[in-house]
UniProtKB/Swiss-Prot annotation:
Origin superkingdom: Eukaryota
Domain Helicase ATP-binding residue range list: 80-250
Example GO BP: mRNA processing
Family statement drawn from the similarity comment of this UniProt entry: Belongs to the DEAD box helicase family. DDX6/DHH1 subfamily.
Gene3D superfamilies for the chain: P-loop containing nucleotide triphosphate hydrolases (3.40.50.300)
Organism expressing this protein natively: Gibberella zeae (strain ATCC MYA-4620 / CBS 123657 / FGSC 9075 / NRRL 31084 / PH-1)
Main location: cytoplasm
Protein name, as recorded: ATP-dependent RNA helicase DHH1
Disordered: annotated span: 1-44, 431-522
Cited SMART domains: DEXDc (SM00487), HELICc (SM00490)
Length: 522
C-alpha cells in the first residue's frame, strides 16, 4: 500500500496556481543552521519523496522546515501517507530514525483547530518523553493554531483541570494521569478520533496494559489506533488482534542496532570501574555523554564520584521529585552540562542530538534494555559510541545480547578512531527549541564556542580558579539561580535518600544539599 501511495505522491506537488509561486513562501522561512554531519542508511535509504509530496498544509510544511527537517526518513515515508488515510498502523523502526515525526506530522495535518475538542491522544511511558513529544508537536505545528497539552503523574491535578477548561486539541501524557482525567470526566475523549502509543512495547507491558484497555473505552469505536516502537513482543500482537482493525504493518528492522553506533566492551573488575571511567573521560572526545547504572542508588553514588573527580555531572532517576527531573532533562538537552548519569528512566525515546557517547557503567540484563540504551547516541543516522564496562558476572549477558541482537561488541582498542564518533563542526548540532520565555534560559546556553562544545574533558582542577569552562565544574556554583536540591549545591549534606556534594573549581561556600525524600514515588 505504501509503495502505491509513494508512486502517486511523487507526482504530487502543492500549487497555488501561479508559476513559481509554490516555492515563493520558502524564501521567508526562518531556517536553522544546516546539520552537515554524516548520516547512515538508517535514514538516507529512502524512496526519494519530499514533504511537499504528501499534500500537507502549507502552515504545517513551514513548521517542518523551520524545525530543521529536509526530507522524510524511511519510517516517515512509510507511515505518513497511510496515517493520513485514517488506517490503523503497527510501525516498527530503529531508535532514532524519526518515529515521533512519523506520527506527529499526520496528526497535525488531520486536526481541525476550529473544533474545540480533544482530537488526538498520544501516550508515552515516561514523563521526560511526554515533555519531549509535546514540544515536537508545538514546534512542528506552531503556525497551525493547535493547542497541545502535556500531563503526567507526579504533579497535582488542579493545573490540568484548569488547562482543560480551554480548548485542547492534542493531549500528550502518561497512561495513569490520562486515565485519572478521563475517569473524572475532565478530559472528554468521546470524540477523539486518534489514539497513538509511542514506545508501544513498554506501554503494553503488564504494568500498563490494564490502564490502556480502560482508556480505549473512552474513545469512539471508529478511532484510529497507531502503535510505534523499536521492538514488538507478543503483547503487541495480542493488543492488535483485539483492538485494531486491519492494521497496516511497517517493519523497517532489517537489523536491530543503528549502523552509526560502534560498540565496545572493556573487561574490568568492579572496584576498577570508576578508574576506567576516569580514563575514558580523559581520552575520549566527548560532546555529551549518558552513563547508565542499574539502580537509583548507584546513579547517585556514581554522580558523586564523577563530581569528586572534577567533571561536570547531572543525575536523574525515577525517585527524584518531578520538578528536579524536569530541570535536569531541560538543562542537559540544552547543553548546560556534559555528562548525565541515569537509570533506565531515560532509555525510552529521549532524543538529544549532541550525545555522541553512551557508557553502560552497569551492563544491562537483557537485549531490549541494551538496545534502547545505546540508541541514545547515533541519533537520526549520525555517529556515536557505546562503551560497556563488563565484569566477570556480565560475561554471559554479553554473549546473550550479542546473539539476540545479531551484533558484535568488540574489545575496546587502545585508541579509538575519532572518525567513528567525533563531529567536525559541533556548533551545527541542532539544539531543541526551548519553551522557556526569553531571559529564563540557562545562563550558559548559546555561549559555547566550537572548541568548548567538543573537547577532551579535563578535571576542574586544571581550570583557572573562579572561571570554570562551560560544561566543567560543579554546575550549581556556576548557576546559583537554581536552588534545586538535585543540583549539587556546594557543601555536603544529607536529606531523604540523596546527598549534596561540593564540586571543585566552583564558587560554592558550604551550605547543604538535599536529595529526594524517601516517600517520593516514580
Amino acid at each position: 500500500m505504501a509503495d502505491q501511495l509513494a508512486d502517486k505522491l511523487k507526482s504530487t506537488q502543492l500549487s497555488d496556481g501561479s508559476p513559481g509561486a509554490s516555492d515563493e513562501w520558502k524564501k521567508n522561512l526562518n531556517l536553522p543552521a544546516k546539520d552537515n554531519r554524516q548520516q547512515t542508511e538508517d535514514v538516507t535509504n529512502t524512496k526519494g519523496l519530499e514533504f511537499e509530496n504528501f499534500a500537507l498544509k502549507r502552515d504545517l510544511l513551514m513548521g517542518i522546515f523551520e524545525a530543521g527537517f529536509e526530507k522524510p526518513s524511511p519510517i516517515q515515508e512509510e507511515s505518513i501517507p497511510v496515517a493520513l488515510t485514517g488506517r490503523d498502523i503497527l510501525a516498527r523502526a530503529k531508535n532514532g530514525t524519526g518515529k515521533t515525526a512519523a506520527f506527529v506530522i499526520p496528526t497535525l495535518e488531520r486536526i481541525n483547530p476550529k473544533i474545540s475538542k480533544i482530537q488526538c491522544l498520544i501516550l508515552v511511558p515516561t514523563r521526560e518523553l511526554a515533555m519531549q513529544t509535546s514540544q515536537v508537536c508545538k514546534t512542528l505545528g506552531k503556525h497551525l493554531g493547535i493547542n497541545v497539552m502535556v500531563t503526567t503523574g507526579g504533579t497535582g491535578l488542579r493545573d490540568d483541570i484548569i488547562r482543560l477548561q480551554d480548548p485542547v486539541h492534542i493531549v500528550v501524557g502518561t497512561p495513569g494521569r490520562i486515565l485519572d482525567l478521563a475517569g473524572k470526566n475532565v478530559a472528554d475523549l468521546s470524540e477523539c478520533p486518534m489514539f497513538i502509543m509511542d514506545e508501544a512495547d513498554k506501554l503494553l507491558s503488564i504494568e500498563f496494559t490494564p490502564v490502556i484497555e480502560q482508556l480505549l473505552q473512552f474513545h469512539p469505536k471508529d478511532r484510529q489506533v497507531m502503535l510505534f516502537s523499536a521492538t514488538f513482543p507478543l503483547s503487541v500482537k495480542d493488543f492488535s488482534d483485539k483492538n485494531m482493525v486491519s492494521p497496516y504493518e511497517i517493519n523497517l528492522m532489517d537489523e536491530l542496532t543503528l549502523r552509526g553506533i560502534t560498540q565496545y566492551y572493556a573487561f574490568v573488575e568492579e572496584k576498577q570501574k570508576v578508574h576506567c571511567l576516569n580514563t575514558l573521560f580523559s581520552k575520549l572526545q566527548i560532546n555529551q555523554s549518558i552513563i547508565f547504572c542499574n539502580s537509583t542508588n548507584r546513579v547517585e553514588l556514581l554522580a558523586k564520584k564523577i563530581t569528586e573527580l572534577g567533571y561536570s555531572c547531572f543525575y536523574s532517576h525515577a525517585k527524584m521529585q518531578q520538578h528536579a527531573r524536569n530541570r535536569v532533562f531541560h538543562d542537559f538537552r540544552n547543553g548546560v552540562c556534559r555528562n548525565l548519569v541515569c537509570s533506565d528512566l531515560l532509555t525510552r525515546g529521549i532524543d538529544i542530538q549532541a550525545v555522541n557517547v553512551v557508557i553502560n557503567f552497569d551492563f544491562p540484563k537483557n537485549a531490549e534494555t541494551y538496545l534502547h540504551r545505546i540508541g541514545r547516541s547515533g541519533r537520526y543516522g549520525h555517529l556515536g559510541l557505546a562503551i560497556n564496562l563488563i565484569n566477570w558476572d556480565d560475561r554471559f549477558n554479553l554473549y546473550n545480547i550479542e546473539r539476540d541482537l545479531g551484533t558484535e561488541i568488540q574489545p575496546i582498542p587502545a585508541s579509538i578512531d575519532k572518525s567513528l564518533y567525533v563531529y567536525e563542526n559541533p556548533e551545527s548540532i541542532p539544539r531543541p527549541i526551548s519553551n522557556l520565555p526569553r531571559g529564563q534560559l540557562p545562563a550558559a546556553q548559546g555561549q559555547q564556542s566550537p572548541q568548548q562544545q567538543q573537547q577532551y574533558q579535563q578535571p576542574q582542577q586544571t581550570q583557572q580558579a573562579g572561571l570554570p569552562q562551560q560544561g566543567q565544574g560543579n554546575w550549581q556554583s556556576q548557576n546559583p539561580q537554581h536552588g534545586n536540591p538535585h543540583y549539587n549545591n556546594g557543601g555536603r549534606g544529607r536529606g531523604g535518600r540523596g546527598r549534596g556534594y561540593r564540586g571543585r573549581g566552583g564558587q560554592g561556600q558550604g551550605g547543604r544539599g538535599r536529595g529526594p525524600p524517601r516517600d517520593v514515588q516514580p
